[in-house]
Amino acid sequence: MDSERRQERIVERMRDRGCRITPQRLAIVHSLFTLGPEHPSIEPLYAAVKRDYPTTSQATVYKTVALLKEMGEVFEVRGADDAAHLEVIRQDTHAHAVCRKCGCIVDVDLDHPDELMSEVATIAEFASLDRMIQFSGVCRDCARASSRDTE
């Protein structure tokens, strides 16, 4: 499903829940998709919406994000800074590689995610698991910078 259709589906689901669909809420949904690869925290999301809708309150952004999380459309990825970074839930299972130095979050597509999730659930004796896999380490840029510093 393409981004535009997905956004329309999310807005329709919000409407079905009785939410008023304001220009600000539409901008929040749209910004989650346009800022998505960056895994934004609330602050950049708020700034993006506020540029077009200066009267938007931070509370509106928080409440809309909370609603989208409750609806299962958005979830939080914890960065190295321990801040909540947002991601629109994708249909595929992928991992996140989080750099402990700069905090960047990289999406990593997996070949056999269902097998991996099933194996982890079996070994850990979990009835179910969220479909999020996260690794932490040091990204290539930070590793290079570190090696230059030690030379």
Model-derived segments and spans:
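Short capping segments at the starts of secondary-structure elements
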Residues: 21-23, 35-41
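Basic amphipathic alpha-helical segments that dock to polyanions
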Residues: 61-71
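Non-DNA-binding regulatory cores of transcription-related proteins
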Residues: 70-151
